[in-house]
Amino acid sequence: MKLRGLYAITDSQLLAGRFLSHVEAALEGGVCLLQYRDKSDDAARRLREAEGLMKLCERYGTQLLINDDAELAARLGVGVHLGQTDGPLTPARALLGRQAIIGSTCHASLELAAQAASEGASYVAFGRFFNSVTKPGAPAANVGLLEQARAQVKLPIAVIGGITLDNAAPLVAHGADLLAVIHGLFGADSAQEVTRRARAFNALFAS
C-alpha cells in the first residue's frame, strides 16, 4: 500500500458528540490513514470506539491505526503508532506481524528516524512543525529537517503539529508523504466542512 495523502487523527474531546459522523465525513473526502488517539483509561469505551472506526475504515478502504496500544491493535488486526515513550518497535512488529502498518514518532530527530527504520517502522513522523494544541511542548521541526529526512530515510514521512490548509503545501513540496492532521480537519463546524477540508488536503498531493 502506498502511504501518501491525508493522515487523519481523532481527538475524543474535540469530536465529543459527533465522533463517528465527523470521522465518516473525513473518510468521504479521502483518508490514507486514520489514527484512533484516545489517552483515557476507559478501556471499554476505547474498544467500542475503535471497533466502530474499524467498520467505517473497512467500508471506505482506509487503514486504521491505534495510538500507543499494540495490544488493542492486535486484537482488532490493525496497525499502531508508537511514541518515544512507548518502547522499541520490535515487540510491536513481532505482535502484529510483517504486514501491519507501524508508525514511529521521531520529533525533530533524524537519529530517531534511523532507529525506527532499523526496528521495522512502516513510516516515520516528524513534528511539531507549527504551534500545536495537542502537543504544545513538542520539539520543533522545520522544512530543512524534512529535506534531510527525505534524502536519508527510505520510508514514507509523516508530518504533524498545527497543520492546516493554510500551511500544509510547503511541507508536501519539501517531501512530506503524509499530512497528519487533527484540529485542522476535525475542528470544522460541520460534517460537510470536514469533507471539504479532507478533499482539499488530498488535492495538495495531486498538484
Curated annotation (Swiss-Prot):
Record bears the keyword Repeat: no
Cofactor: Mg(2+)
Broad EC category: transferase
Enzyme nomenclature, EC number: 2.5.1.3
Pathway: Cofactor biosynthesis; thiamine diphosphate biosynthesis; thiamine phosphate from 4-amino-2-methyl-5-diphosphomethylpyrimidine and 4-methyl-5-(2-phosphoethyl)-thiazole: step 1/1
Binding sites annotated in the UniProt record for 4-amino-2-methyl-5-(diphosphooxymethyl)pyrimidine: 35-39, 67, 105, 135
CDD domains (alphabetical): TMP_TenI
Binding-site positions, Mg(2+): 68, 86
Any GO molecular function: thiamine-phosphate diphosphorylase activity
Residues noted as binding 2-[(2R,5Z)-2-carboxy-4-methylthiazol-5(2H)-ylidene]ethyl phosphate in the record, renumbered to the chain: 132-134, 162
The protein's name in its UniProt record: Thiamine-phosphate synthase
InterPro entries associated with the record: Aldolase_TIM, ThiamineP_synth_sf, ThiamineP_synth_TenI, TMP_synthase
Swiss-Prot/TrEMBL keywords: Magnesium, Metal-binding, Thiamine biosynthesis, Transferase
One GO cellular component, as annotated: cytoplasm
Family according to the record: Belongs to the thiamine-phosphate synthase family.
Cofactor note: Binds 1 Mg(2+) ion per subunit.
Native organism taxonomy: Bacteria, Pseudomonadati, Pseudomonadota, Gammaproteobacteria, Pseudomonadales
Pfam families membership: TMP-TENI
Role: Condenses 4-methyl-5-(beta-hydroxyethyl)thiazole monophosphate (THZ-P) and 2-methyl-4-amino-5-hydroxymethyl pyrimidine pyrophosphate (HMP-PP) to form thiamine monophosphate (TMP).
GO BP terms in the entry: thiamine biosynthetic process; thiamine diphosphate biosynthetic process
The reaction(s) this protein catalyses: 2-[(2R,5Z)-2-carboxy-4-methylthiazol-5(2H)-ylidene]ethyl phosphate + 4-amino-2-methyl-5-(diphosphooxymethyl)pyrimidine + 2 H(+) = thiamine phosphate + CO2 + diphosphate; 2-(2-carboxy-4-methylthiazol-5-yl)ethyl phosphate + 4-amino-2-methyl-5-(diphosphooxymethyl)pyrimidine + 2 H(+) = thiamine phosphate + CO2 + diphosphate; 4-methyl-5-(2-phosphooxyethyl)-thiazole + 4-amino-2-methyl-5-(diphosphooxymethyl)pyrimidine + H(+) = thiamine phosphate + diphosphate
